[in-house]
């Protein structure tokens, strides 16, 4: 039985390809880098951002915690984290884009405390983030879950050897962000290796955090 295809691409070859094309930035790479940008009090300029909903929603969440966000154009933004006055990421931001929880690792790393709504509201089992929390605890943070909110705080964060039970892009980025400001060295084993992970590593290395990826 053949499935009826309502939409098709019909390609007729035999003609040499020529011309130019501009490749846009990767959304998943941009999300991690935008979260990391709040960790410094200097102004960070990020170029070649894709002009898509998820990016704009995360920028709104970053503004919501008090950071300064200046849109230069649809693909360039300046972020300054020195004006942050709120360490809570509310459920509305998480509901719109799950990657808002990257701000949890960034805020924990910068201020040793952060609060974020569970991605599934009060239902932690909907899309579990246990590997994120495991990593934060390994760095020395106390993690509690109350009334649909994840609360993290630490007197100080200390590097550790962390093994992820499952490969997780989100956990890898979140733990990496938190560990950037921790004392000592952190090793994340069984980490995700997607290209946007490498981009986030490259950014943190550029910001003078000594970060390496063994691929």
State what each model feature region is.
Residues 127, 144-157, 195-196:
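Intrinsically disordered, low-complexity linker/loop segments enriched in Gly/Pro
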Residues 67-68:
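A glycine-rich helix N-cap at a beta->alpha junction
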Residues 71-72:
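Active-site cofactor/substrate anionic-group-binding motifs, chiefly glycine-
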Residues 1-4:
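Short, Lys/Arg-enriched N-terminal segments with co-localized hydrophobic residues
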Residues 204-211:
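Conserved small/polar residues in nucleotide/adenosyl-binding loops
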Residues 6-51, 76-124, 153-193:
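Structural motif
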Residues 127-138:
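Well-ordered mid-protein domain cores that form the structural environment of catalytic cofactors
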